[in-house]
Amino acid sequence: MAAYRADDDYDFLYKVVLIGDSGVGKSNLLSRFTRNEFSLESKSTIGVEFATRSIHVDEKIVKAQIWDTAGQERYRAITSAYYRGAVGALLVYDVTRHVTFENVERWLKELRDHTEANIVIMLVGNKADLRHLRAVSTEDAKAFAERENTFFMETSALEALNVENAFTEVLSQIYRVASKKALDIGDDHTTLPKGQSINVGSKDDVSEVKKVGCCSS
């Protein structure tokens, strides 16, 4: 169960990045999850910003530091710093603009080029409330997610549909993979000091966790 907590009260800190084309709704997903706000006049993010929110996972407090940047090509120079240390990602496209879904493959390659193979990835089809304008089918997106071994959800930042679920699923999976990795090496990741970064293991570890609950829509 997710809950708002004081910023300094947490057991683990995970960096999660939002990626995808400009205008797909990344900033509104972030503000909906962290502040329960939505702006119809949202402008393109200039540079980088991040927000935080803590949730409960298995009686531990997991704090997400969620980074957001504009998708325009001219900001690609910040790529390395943006991705560094990320253990989770939400790869966002707009269900009403097919080109944003076509570009998901490029974003995914860039993400994997700059992060560890074990990163937990959620493919997110945003603006699902605009049913009459849909240009990307749920089936096509789900097939892509299964092929690329990522999680998948459709969301609406406007209606707050699945926004909570998408972020909490990513954070829960990061926690579970990290816990399994610690168990495999005979350590207990729940005893690590506050703020210590977590190596969430290999890509196989992520795949194994995915078998439990993948690709809900």
UniProtKB/Swiss-Prot annotation:
<feature type="binding site">
    <location>
        <begin position="68"/>
        <end position="72"/>
    </location>
    <ligand>
        <name>GTP</name>
    </ligand>
</feature>
<keyword id="KW-0342">GTP-binding</keyword>
<dbReference type="InterPro" id="IPR001806">
    <property type="entry name" value="Small_GTPase"/>
</dbReference>
<keyword id="KW-0813">Transport</keyword>
<keyword id="KW-0653">Protein transport</keyword>
<dbReference type="InterPro" id="IPR027417">
    <property type="entry name" value="P-loop_NTPase"/>
</dbReference>
<comment type="similarity">
    <text>Belongs to the small GTPase superfamily. Rab family.</text>
</comment>
<feature type="short sequence motif" description="Effector region">
    <location>
        <begin position="42"/>
        <end position="50"/>
    </location>
</feature>
<keyword id="KW-1003">Cell membrane</keyword>
<dbReference type="GO" id="GO:0005886">
    <property type="term" value="C:plasma membrane"/>
</dbReference>
<keyword id="KW-0636">Prenylation</keyword>
<comment type="function">
    <text>Intracellular vesicle trafficking and protein transport.</text>
</comment>
<feature type="binding site">
    <location>
        <begin position="20"/>
        <end position="27"/>
    </location>
    <ligand>
        <name>GTP</name>
    </ligand>
</feature>
<feature type="lipid moiety-binding region" description="S-geranylgeranyl cysteine">
    <location>
        <position position="214"/>
    </location>
</feature>
<dbReference type="GO" id="GO:0015031">
    <property type="term" value="P:protein transport"/>
</dbReference>
<feature type="binding site">
    <location>
        <begin position="126"/>
        <end position="129"/>
    </location>
    <ligand>
        <name>GTP</name>
    </ligand>
</feature>
<feature type="lipid moiety-binding region" description="S-geranylgeranyl cysteine">
    <location>
        <position position="215"/>
    </location>
</feature>
<keyword id="KW-0547">Nucleotide-binding</keyword>
<dbReference type="InterPro" id="IPR005225">
    <property type="entry name" value="Small_GTP-bd"/>
</dbReference>
<dbReference type="InterPro" id="IPR050209">
    <property type="entry name" value="Rab_GTPases_membrane_traffic"/>
</dbReference>
<keyword id="KW-0449">Lipoprotein</keyword>
<feature type="binding site">
    <location>
        <begin position="156"/>
        <end position="157"/>
    </location>
    <ligand>
        <name>GTP</name>
    </ligand>
</feature>
<protein>
    <recommendedName>
        <fullName>Ras-related protein RABA1g</fullName>
    </recommendedName>
</protein>
<dbReference type="Pfam" id="PF00071">
    <property type="entry name" value="Ras"/>
</dbReference>
<keyword id="KW-0472">Membrane</keyword>
<dbReference type="GO" id="GO:0003924">
    <property type="term" value="F:GTPase activity"/>
</dbReference>
<dbReference type="GO" id="GO:0005525">
    <property type="term" value="F:GTP binding"/>
</dbReference>
<dbReference type="GO" id="GO:0042546">
    <property type="term" value="P:cell wall biogenesis"/>
</dbReference>
